[in-house]
Amino acid sequence: MYFAYGSNMNLDQMAMRCPGAVLGQIVCLPDWQYFINGNGYAGIEKKEGSKVLGCLWTLKEKHWRALDHYEGVAGGYYERVEMEVGLLGQNTFAKVWVYLSCNYQYGIPQPRYQIAVVEGARQVQLPVDYLPILESWVNGCPD
C-alpha cells in the first residue's frame, strides 16, 4: 500500500502515472506536518501534535517503478520508506510505503502544483477541516 499526501492524491494524475491503481481509504500520519520543499513539491516532516492526511493506493510492481521514476528516487529527490499510518476514524494502523522528500528547505510550489494537490484532496474526500492546511501553501510558505 502507498500513502499519498501530495499531488498523487489527484485522481487524474494517478490515472496517468499508474493506470489501474486502486484508491483506498483516507489515513492519518500523526506527529508529521505537510510542507512544500525547496524544489517546489510536497514533503512531510516530523512535528509533534501535527498530522498529515492522505489516501492509500494499492499498487502493482509496474506502478512502483513508475512512481519511483516520477518521484526522482534514483536522483535523490525522494526516498521510499515504510511507515505506520492510522485509518481515519478507526483505532487501526497499517504499514504503508511513503515517499519522503530529501530536501527539507521550505519553498514555493511549482506552477499549478499545489492547486493539483488541493484538487486531489477534494477528489479523495479528505476532511474539509484539513483543506486549509494544503490551501495555505498555494503561494508558498504560510507565515
Where are these predicted regions, by residue range?
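Glycine-aromatic micro-motifs
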Residues: 1-143
